[in-house]
């Protein structure tokens, strides 16, 4: 077995890993990046996450004008494959052509804090690295229940790659991933049922927001949400698979299990490197994302919020220690905007009304129904509402929840205002173009 020495070893071709590799090489450093699968060059987002799922949401909306939903679905899947293949190749070629970067396709495991064994198709080699960065991501959690081996039971990756449109889809789990897939498949004409084990729908959201989401789901494709539905087992039959729950039985041609994600750490043999895990199984790091004196973890595997843009910010934190002043930490990102790409999108930043009430701070709630926005009427998208929490003493925005068209774009404007302490009054009087969703901020912050 050959042994090689390198200043930097990156395990995982995700957003943080690939960006760090390119940056280090452009500063004259030598880097080896190891990726387990050629099908994952570029990471989760472009291959089995953000990009293909959003494409299918868009294609689903387009299919509303078509009568042959099955053909539209198959065409959408072909476009998904074309797009992800192109992005995967572009990501590989962009990195592989940078002098100083070498990409190995294989599995990596630690032998010691500085030595990693990499097994490729050509055999095994040992890599001794001064600094090692782990960016292996996460994968969908599974259910170890009777009948779960049925091939019609999918995780999110599998449901993005179906060959044919199911007439019925049952989704186990009522979280944000479930909502996106519900909207996606309902748009293509699939009958969708969401099974939520808890007794509260979208427990982290304000009740008026959750109720607005329920109303939208019911209106758009008749998505059904069942609460307190604990999944017990699956029953396989030739024509369908049945999900047996505490609230009854639900048959479908496809079942999605969307109950969270688990870190990809098992194959790494982290104990050999002295790397510790959190109680939830993610890599334990400090505020600089350092797991040991010479090992860093970035992205989902580090327990960071599971968004591509957070993985990118993780890169910035680690990069600052290697190439910068070393001052940037996870504590610097106080405000994190989020978006759920339902139809319309649900986006949030800062405090919700529920959190504001628990904080003890003086506040008022600004509220505007989406139906009051002229551009929403033009688009025919009048579901939802906009909410903002404003400090009554300072006039500063404490948080916002937007459930309306273009919410995923508009939330970034509100985050920017909050970051720079721009008062709500400035948005109330700001001149916006018309007709736009952004101009609704005038009315939102003028509301009582």
For each feature predicted by the language model, list its residue ranges:
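N-terminal Rossmann-like dinucleotide/flavin-binding domain of flavoprotein oxidoreductases
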Residues: 2-6, 44-129, 205-232, 353-355, ...
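Core beta-strand elements of the Rossmann-like FAD/NAD(P) dinucleotide-binding domain
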Residues: 4-6, 122-131, 246-254, 291-292
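Beta1-alpha1 glycine-rich phosphate/pyrophosphate-binding loop at the start
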Residues: 6-8, 13-87, 184-204, 409
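Flexible, glycine-rich terminal cap/loop adjacent to redox cofactors
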Residues: 9-39, 44, 51, 55-56, ...
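Rossmann-like dinucleotide-binding cores of NAD(P)H-dependent redox enzymes
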Residues: 42, 82-89, 160-161, 166-170, ...
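Glycine-rich dinucleotide-binding loop and its adjacent helix/turn
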Residues: 50, 136-191, 195, 225, ...
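A Rossmann-like FAD-binding core segment of flavoenzymes
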Residues: 102-105, 109-120, 189-287, 351, ...
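FAD-site-proximal beta/loop scaffold in flavoenzymes
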Residues: 150-166, 249-325
């Amino acid at each position: 077995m050959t042994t090689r020495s390198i200043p930097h070893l990156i395990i995982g071709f995700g957003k943080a890993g690939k960006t760090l590799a390119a940056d280090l090489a452009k500063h004259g450093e030598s880097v080896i990046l190891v990726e387990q699968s050629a099908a994952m060059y570029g990471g989760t987002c472009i291959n089995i996450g953000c990009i293909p799922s959003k494409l299918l949401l868009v294609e689903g909306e387009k299919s509303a004008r078509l009568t042959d939903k099955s053909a539209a679905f198959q065409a959408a899947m072909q476009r998904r494959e074309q797009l992800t293949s192109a992005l995967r190749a572009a990501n590989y070629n962009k990195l592989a052509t940078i002098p100083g970067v070498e990409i190995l396709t294989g599995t990596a495991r630690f032998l010691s804090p500085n030595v990693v064994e990499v097994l490729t198709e050509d055999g095994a080699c040992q890599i001794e690295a001064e600094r090692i960065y782990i960016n292996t991501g996460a994968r969908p959690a599974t259910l170890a229940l009777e009948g779960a081996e049925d091939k019609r039971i999918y995780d999110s990756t599998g449901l993005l790659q179906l060959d044919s449109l199911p007439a019925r889809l049952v989704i186990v789990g009522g979280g944000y991933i479930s909502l996106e897939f519900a909207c996606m498949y309902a748009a293509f004409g699939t009958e969708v049922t969401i099974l939520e084990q808890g007794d509260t729908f979208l427990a982290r959201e304000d009740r008026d927001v959750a109720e607005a989401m329920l109303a939208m789901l019911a209106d758009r494709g008749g998505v059904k949400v069942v609460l307190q539905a604990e999944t017990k087992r699956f029953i396989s039959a030739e024509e369908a698979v049945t999900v047996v729950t505490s609230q009854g039985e639900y048959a479908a041609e496809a079942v999605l299990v969307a109950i969270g994600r688990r870190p990809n750490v098992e194959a790494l043999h982290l104990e050999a490197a002295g790397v510790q895990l959190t109680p939830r199984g993610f890599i334990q790091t400090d505020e600089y994302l350092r797991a040991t004196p010479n090992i860093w973890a970035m992205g989902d595997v580090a327990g960071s919020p599971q968004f591509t843009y957070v993985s990118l910010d993780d890169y910035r934190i680690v990069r600052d220690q290697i190439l910068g002043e070393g001052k940037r930490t996870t504590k610097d990102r106080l405000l994190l905007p989020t978006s759920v790409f339902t139809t319309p999108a649900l986006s949030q930043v800062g405090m919700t009304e529920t959190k504001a009430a628990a904080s003890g701070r003086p506040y008022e709630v600004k509220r505007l129904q989406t139906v009051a926005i002229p551009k929403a009427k033009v688009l025919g998208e009048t579901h939802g509402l906009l909410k903002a929490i404003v400090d009554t003493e300072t006039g500063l925005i404490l948080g916002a929840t937007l459930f309306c068209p273009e919410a995923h774009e508009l939330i970034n404007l509100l985050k920017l205002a909050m970051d720079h302490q721009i008062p709500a009054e400035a948005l109330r009087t700001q001149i916006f173009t018309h007709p736009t969703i952004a101009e609704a901020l005038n009315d939102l912050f003028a509301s009582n």
